[in-house]
Amino acid sequence: MSTDEPLSGNPSSRTGQNDARTTRPMPVAGEAGADGFIASLSNGRYQLVERIGAGSIGQVWRAQDTTLQREVAIKTINLATSADPSTEARFRREAIATAGLNHPNIVQIYDSGVDGHSAYIVMEFLHGPNLQSIVTKRGPIDWRDAVPLLAQVAAGLGSAHRLGVVHRDVKPANVVLSSEELTSTPKLVDFGIARLADQQATALTSTMTAIGSAAYMSPEQAAGERVGPNSDMYSFGCLMMTVLTGQPPFPGESPVAVARAQVYDTPPLLRSRVPDAPASLENLVAALMNKRPEARPSATETVAALNAIHGDPDAPGLIEPPRPAGPGT
């Protein structure tokens, strides 16, 4: 899981209750030690300006890169809760893999550092809200506006998948716009953080941190099985349902109940909530939320389908709806 805030973003897009801010230059685990920790690992390069979010394993800061004179976002991560001595090495591997993702719809990673107990990641600062904030404040996005935006998000996922990188926490809060305009560039954030946090968590902690993401977990992820790119695509289908309808496919207060629904329940059809949506879009969402991972469209297929819908919503879709399960299946 990620912290409550995505890796980068605008303070106006905060969804948590943390509103503490600072404008002091550099004093990452706790708030008081964040400046000193980052300063020691970066030779004073980064100056913290404002804390814009906090969660169970870290904080998100707006900062200034004093070397390149640019605004950046810094996420600090607390590794001290892990008893596994390999946590630091895993973080380094995740940071390297994420930094290797070069795509206009993936947040750009500039730098990272770790000292065994705390770590930080430096990335581009995004001035827009995340999709969850937009849906919460404004309601669902009209499908005509959402389709081209969603195609870009799927393109970012496809780029990562081709390099063997799985996001593991695809949800509206982890898609941030580059500006306040809905037509601005959407960028995926928090690659690898979900895996890092899950590997640290006890069973109880894992259950508690699932509250924010259970609504977007694939059935195999909810069951604790190994996940791959197909898991991200199921989560993307859930994200599409939220963006287009204003709520996830299986809303609920209990993460355990929601996770169980992901495994066993049939997702609602898109047009049961958005009657004017084209059948091709409904079929795509249903196919993405197929319980069988191998039956889901890939990111590349999803991009093609969304682009086709954007070009001609009334044309036959590129993705067929899932076939009903037969007796005994």
Regions found by a protein language model. Name each.
Residues 76-100:
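AlphaC helix of the eukaryotic protein kinase fold
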Residues 48-55, 60:
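Protein kinase glycine-rich loop
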Residues 154-165:
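Protein kinase catalytic-loop region centered on the HRD/HxD motif
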Residues 116-130, 134:
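Conserved short submotifs of the Hanks-type protein kinase catalytic core
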Residues 82-86, 178-226, 253:
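Activation segment of protein kinases
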Residues 215-315:
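C-terminal lobe helix-coil module of Hanks-type protein kinase domains
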Residues 112:
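Activation-segment/catalytic-loop signature of the eukaryotic protein kinase fold
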Residues 149-150:
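Activation segment signature within eukaryotic-like protein kinase domains
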